[in-house]
């Protein structure tokens, strides 16, 4: 993989959303200094007010360098001491994944985006076939205005794929989805897909938006 990502999903305690965002901003400053690209994305429809704290690296070596830097970091010792003394949220899940497109770099995600995310659990031995289907769909979705990124799960998300559609704003998302209605190439693709062997199950489908870096 090129673009390697770790995702930490947090939920703020009641009345603590602002404090959690402040804590994430402090963590992001440390992670950035140690070589990671950081984005903070709030879930929207289809979720339960979760916030993704996302770390990205260009490759495995950069990923490992950041991990090693954390081991002896006084900044992290101080950060976790402060956070533990006044916790503002609870981590609900964490997982790692790699972008199947090896030309994509972590810096390609710098900026603010709106996301539509589908999470799939693939049947054993069917990962390559699912990627091929995803890539066929990718061409149609990009013609409709989406930027498509496909992640294959690693630690914490074995047998999972995250199919991510990215847009500059909500208006762009709406315009893209409008192009995928009845009579469109996407509608035809979905009809054909319904006749294929089932090799994966969709387990989650939600929108999100960048709220910090």
Language-model regions, residue ranges each:
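Short S/T/G/P-rich N-terminal loop/turn motif that feeds into the first structured element of a domain
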Residues: 1-213
């Amino acid at each position: 993989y090129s673009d390697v990502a770790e995702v930490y999903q947090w939920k703020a305690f009641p009345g603590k959303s602002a404090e959690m965002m402040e804590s994430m901003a402090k963590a992001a400053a440390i992670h950035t200094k140690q070589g990671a690209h950081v984005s903070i994305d709030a879930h929207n429809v289809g979720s339960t007010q979760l916030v993704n704290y996302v770390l990205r690296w260009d490759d495995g070596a950069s990923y490992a360098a950041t991990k090693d830097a954390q081991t002896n970091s006084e900044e992290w010792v101080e950060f976790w001491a402060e956070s533990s003394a006044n916790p503002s949220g609870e981590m609900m899940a964490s997982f790692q994944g790699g972008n199947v497109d090896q030309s994509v770099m972590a810096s390609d995600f710098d900026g603010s985006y709106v996301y539509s995310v589908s999470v799939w659990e693939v049947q054993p031995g069917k990962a390559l076939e699912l990627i091929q289907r995803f890539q066929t769909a990718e061409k149609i979705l990009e013609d409709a205005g989406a930027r498509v990124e496909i992640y294959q799960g690693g630690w914490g998300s074995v047998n999972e794929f995250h199919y991510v559609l990215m847009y500059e704003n909500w208006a762009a998302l709406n315009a893209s989805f409008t192009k995928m209605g009845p009579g469109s190439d996407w509608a035809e693709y979905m009809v054909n897909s319904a006749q294929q062997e089932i090799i994966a199950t969709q387990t989650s489908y939600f929108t999100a938006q960048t709220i910090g870096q």
